[in-house]
Regions:
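Glycine-rich, basic loop-to-helix element that forms the pyrophosphate-binding segment
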Residues: 67-85
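A conserved acidic beta->alpha catalytic loop
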Residues: 42-51, 70
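A short, conserved alpha-helix in the catalytic core of glycosyltransferases
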Residues: 167-186, 190-218
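Short, flexible, basic/aromatic active-site loop/helix in glycosyltransferases
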Residues: 138-167, 171
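Short aromatic/hydrophobic "clamp" motif used to bind/position activated sugar donors
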Residues: 90
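Active-site-adjacent helix/loop segment of glycosyltransferases
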Residues: 202-281
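Conserved donor NDP-sugar-binding/catalytic core segment of glycosyltransferases
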Residues: 98-132
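Short, acidic, metal-binding catalytic loop of nucleotide-sugar glycosyltransferases
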Residues: 27-36
Length: 283
């Protein structure tokens, strides 16, 4: 379906050792309504990811790619893809997200109706189990010190609402107007991996825009394709990202004691989380 550039969507995919799902992801994006540009930023893949991307680029002039010689992180690569595109809408799509033909166009419709807005989808795994990261509230680290239950950021789906307002959606799939992305300065490149989506959603809300999930737009998210080979690396940057998020948004209003306690809570948890992640990959 041909869509004029005034409504065009740039689909931005960051790949790293993503060959397992990348071919399917890109083919679906090429078939998707509203997609005017596809930008793939490859962060130093050692598998067949680049060969897959090159094959799609030859077949479809809408697709261009940047092959980074190292891995500067997800946020940096997303910003690279946004800067290399020009149409009014930006969709950040993980290589393990498998969109349907109408997915991005429907998200754009919701974002237009709620303007300005950043919109995510109802993410499920291959068995139909919902991803709790699709609907989240902001972390409250002081509350986590009082109760471990506060660490659970997931928000239940509101089955009565086609569009559910939340604090944050998953960076695995999010769509927003380019002008809004540029107004907040894009992704914070101080994050290497994880929590950059929480950060972006918070800054979007801080400028008066909305963050929401289109509950009736379901997308399969095959989680963890790129991270299975390096579980300890992923956990390290996940915890580092949480500490950065706390430092930006919560630490300035907390006492020195609370800041020290949060630091200890995050980094004491890291070795246990890393061990669990490592054991999961060996099953």
């Amino acid at each position: 379906m041909s869509v004029p550039d005034i409504a065009g969507i740039a689909a931005i995919v960051v790949s790293h050792d993503s060959e397992e799902t990348l071919d399917d992801c890109l083919q679906r994006l090429r078939n998707a309504d509203g997609v005017a540009e596809i930008r793939v930023i490859d962060n130093d893949s050692s598998d067949a990811s680049l060969e897959i991307v090159q094959r799609h680029a030859v077949a479809d002039p809408r697709l261009r790619f940047i092959a980074n010689p190292d891995n500067p992180g997800f946020a940096v690569a997303c910003n690279q893809g946004a800067a290399d595109s020009s149409v009014p809408w930006l969709a950040f799509v993980n290589p393990d997200c498998l969109v349907e033909v109408d997915t991005l166009a429907r998200l754009r419709e919701h974002a237009e109706q709620e303007a300005p807005a950043l919109v995510g989808a109802d993410l499920v795994d291959e068995d139909g189990v919902r991803d709790v990261a699709a609907r989240r509230h902001d972390p409250d680290f002081a509350a986590m010190l009082r109760s471990p239950a506060a660490a659970r950021l997931g928000v239940e789906i509101d089955t009565t609402a086609s569009l559910q307002h939340v604090d944050a959606v998953s960076g695995a799939l999010m769509l927003l107007p380019r002008w809004l992305f540029e107004r907040v300065g894009g992704f914070d490149v101080g994050y290497r991996l994880h929590a950059e989506d929480l950060d972006l959603c918070r800054r979007v809300r801080d400028v008066g825009a909305r963050v929401a999930v289109a509950n009736e737009v379901r997308v399969v998210h095959v989680r963890g394709v790129s991270s299975r080979s390096r579980p300890v690396f992923v956990e390290w940057h996940k915890h580092r990202g949480l500490w950065r998020y706390f430092g930006k948004f919560e630490a300035p209003r907390r006492s020195g004691f609370v800041r020290a306690a949060v630091f200890a809570m995050i980094w004491v948890r890291f070795p246990f989380a890393a061990l669990r992640a490592l054991l999961r990959t060996q099953r």
